[in-house]
Amino acid sequence: MKLKTGAGAAFIGVMASATLAAADEEPKYGGTLTYMIPADAPPSFDGHREATYATVHSAAPYYSVLIRVNPDNPGSASDFVCDLCTAMPQPTDDGKTYTFKIRDGVKFHDGSLLTAYDVAASWNKIINPPEGVTSARQSFYIMVDKIETPDPLTVVFRLKFPTSAFLPALADPFTWIYKKETLDKDPHWYEKNILGSGPFKFVEYQAGHSIKGERNKDYHHKGLPYLDAITGIYADKQAVRVEAIRSDRAAIEFRSLPPSAVDELVGALGDKVTVQTSDWNCALIVTPNHKRKPFNDARVRRALTLAMDRWHGAPALSKIAIVHTVGGIVFPGSPLAATKEELEQIAGYWPDAEKSRVEARRLLKEAGADGLSFELLNRSVDQPFKYLGIWLVDEWSKIGVKVTQRVLPTGPWFEGLRNGSFDVAIEGNCQSVINPVLDVSKYQPHSVFTEQYGNFDDPHDIDLYQSMLNETDPAKQRALMRQFEKYVLEEQTHEIMTLWWYRIVPHRSYVKGWKIGPSHFLNQDLATVWLDK
């Protein structure tokens, strides 16, 4: 049953019917959900530090957040609900003050009470991390002036300027609430340990194998969770994960599988498997290390993007990998995204691939980089890292560039990115809630965005971004986004976009209560999941 054919269209109709039927069913309590995590291990357990699904899928069920996207409507960019707060507040002070009341009686898993002081301490670690502590999304919150706690059950966020980007940023799923007492003693403690107030209590972690949790009987959302226990199994090989679902040793992988693997499962299991699909706020990018020659030369960086024929590559790759759409730096189809006509004006997106490659060869010669060879740092994850890596090596060979790959497990790969030990790297810009202005903040220098690995300084880049962030007129903001996009992708080629992803999640049909969203980071606390068996 092919997802791209008429049969696939019928298949999607079946999926919709199944979802509607599930909504009318009474949830059942009990059972253990076993799910696959497509990684060898998370780089750490600290959600504030990390930017990978390996951390979220491992530890999100053990934590609470202040607010979140509605788990019944995870595709929304504006439907936010309280987790630890009692009600979504209306902003005051001309949109610059948000006051949250915190639920009374919430407990951490060690039995201690969670208060506004814990919420404020966690958010201060995210927004203003102490020296030596990494905060992956610190730049998302540059609009925040200060956080106040007038009493144990009240948290007040005061902004420097009003912006519609604030609430979506506050709903980021990595913003777990930690215990203030623990953070005061050691802000690095949560990198290797788990202690939260989420729907499940942490039980056991076996490095490279599994992570287990049990139902939190004191969970602050009455009646949840439904499951008795959860077990996440680590496996970086796709074949292992597919076979686990086929043989019912696992029920689901929350990230995504490619069409070929989904077809295999549907063919083998029929109505015993259900498939959910969604556009995906995620794309792999190619990051040149500006501190290594010749990648300090914009002409060389531009040659690499000109070599890539995205328009013909996307249809072919979408048959075997979880990629789908040609796009710029903004989530395709969203109001601030470039149209196809606008994209075609940017180097690397020209309709004529041969014209692009002629220009690429000219630039390499002009820069004295004829016969260029380099090493590409890649991640040891099949989808879509390895597939994109093979494609990139082939594309670059068409302009006479020779590339070898250094493929590393998730932890060492992240370490290589962070310490700059690479020529060029494949990495990702994968966000959660669709929030275009903040989603593109990654394309600023490391001094502003800590998870920027290109090692460049560029005040003009920062100025362009700040102008866009502070602009409240939608049309003017869109025009500024086009300027920023062309500057990042062509004029300086600080980053090189590959393709945007498409999320396809097959799961055992007895798994109910989970809905797919535009990000593999969303809806992962598993509180509403139940098993119909």
Q: In which residue ranges do the predicted regions lie?
A:
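N-terminal lobe/hinge region of extracytoplasmic solute-binding protein
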Residues: 36-93, 124, 193-196
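Gly/Pro-rich hinge or "lid" segments in bacterial periplasmic/extracellular proteins
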Residues: 67-75, 171-225, 229, 358, ...
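Short helix-initiation/N-cap motifs at beta->coil->alpha
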Residues: 142, 195, 231-243, 256-260, ...
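Aromatic- and charge-enriched surface segment that lines or borders ligand/interaction sites
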Residues: 87-132, 156, 241-244, 294-297, ...
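Extracellular/periplasmic solute-recognition and catalytic clefts
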Residues: 146-147, 203-212, 231-292, 315-316, ...
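Surface-exposed binding/hinge segments that line
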Residues: 4, 21, 28, 101, ...
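Alpha-helical secondary-structure segments
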Residues: 34, 115-122, 152-158, 198-199, ...
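Detector for C-terminal structural segments
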Residues: 52-53, 57-61, 206, 210, ...
